[in-house]
Amino acid sequence: MSRKLTDYTTAAERSDLDILIKVGVSVSAYKAAMTRLGFSLGSIYPVSEHWPVLLVSTSEDADFLTKGFMDALTQRQIPFKLAVFWNNHYQINGDSVAPITQKYLQDGWQYSRSVVLLKSVISGSCVVRTNLLALLAEIDVAFLERH
């Protein structure tokens, strides 16, 4: 497997990424590595204004990657809101579709000024696009323009 890492990737992060592609890795090792990677990302997230950051996640990433990111923001006292989506991703006539079957939008999510979309595996843009478009359709643009 070929991957390209930035100069900012630490040895610990490289080790965690290696765990994720290791054949036969235990569930607990995978969970711990994914949570640490989320924490690493949350640790370098730039501090913004007093507005909460909106964390957007699929349900399968919420347990580990997103949790690690949330833990880092909590430790840094950066406010956040959470949006989690459940999708039914499938192919129909050669096209990829991913309708939303359930969603959780934490109260006040629409007042966030920045969005972090956390996704561990992006095999295509279908799920990401569907979830992001659903959020954008619900944003109160008039509120954002006033503030």
What is each PLM-predicted segment?
Residues 1-147:
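PRPP-associated nucleotide enzymes
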